[in-house]
Structure formats: structure tokens, C-alpha cells
A protein has these predicted regions:
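Residue-level hotspots at or immediately adjacent to binding/recognition sites across diverse folds
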Residues: 17, 32, 50-52, 64-71, ...
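Conserved strand-loop elements at the edges of beta-sheets that form or border functional pockets
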Residues: 14, 44, 94
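Short secondary-structure junctions
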Residues: 28-35, 87-91
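Conserved short beta-strand elements that form part of the metal-binding/catalytic scaffold
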Residues: 30-62
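Vicinal oxygen chelate
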Residues: 68-98
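Conserved active-site tyrosine of GNAT-family acetyltransferases
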Residues: 23-24, 81
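N-terminal beta-strand motif that seeds the catalytic metal site of vicinal oxygen chelate
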Residues: 1-21, 48, 65-67
Length: 98
């Protein structure tokens, strides 16, 4: 897969790093590095990124970016999300390229 001009690093706002880290570790097995009170980096095995401290977090419904995560087993991933404290806002649906 070409890597030129592909998303290389992703930064997202978060108001509660511990909750964000706990959720993504449990639901998706992401690895985290703590860089102090204002930043927490992650790696999911394919992309690196981080969460920066912000009290002004938004949702896709309010104009924030919609990020699609790939999963081989959608039903199992849905169960992992729920068991990790996440909420399903839109159930599994057909998506272009999926």
C-alpha cells in the first residue's frame, strides 16, 4: 500500500486521559505512552497518534471528524466496545470499501 501523502499521525482531543486509555486498551488493545498532564500517545499497530488535553471535545454529530476503525470481526468488536464501557451510537452498517 502506498504511504506517500497518507495519514501518518492522528491527534484527538480528550478531557479524561485515564478513561480514554482504559477504553482503547480494553476494546482494541492499543498501547499508550504518557507524556504528562497534557498529552498521551497511542499506537494501534498500524498508526501512531495521541490525545491532547481539551475540555472542548466534540462529536461527529457536532462537526468533528468521523473516524472509521477496521475490524475483521465486527460483532466481536462491538461486544468488546460495550464490555469496555463504550456506547454504540450507530449499529453495524454497510460502508463503502468495507
Amino acid at each position: 500500500m502506498p504511504t506517500d501523502q497518507k495519514v501518518d499521525y492522528l491527534e484527538l482531543p480528550a478531557s479524561d486521559f485515564d478513561a480514554v486509555q482504559s477504553f482503547y486498551e480494553k476494546a482494541f488493545n492499543w498501547k499508550f505512552t504518557d507524556y504528562g498532564p497534557d498529552y498521551r500517545a497511542f499506537n494501534d499497530g498500524k498508526i501512531d497518534g495521541g490525545f491532547y488535553k481539551s475540555e472542548n471535545c466534540s462529536s461527529a454529530e457536532n462537526g468533528a471528524a468521523l473516524i472509521i476503525l477496521y475490524a475483521d470481526d465486527l460483532e466481536q468488536t462491538k461486544e468488546n466496545v460495550i464490555n469496555s464501557g463504550g456506547k454504540i451510537l450507530k449499529d453495524i452498517f454497510s460502508f463503502p470499501r468495507s
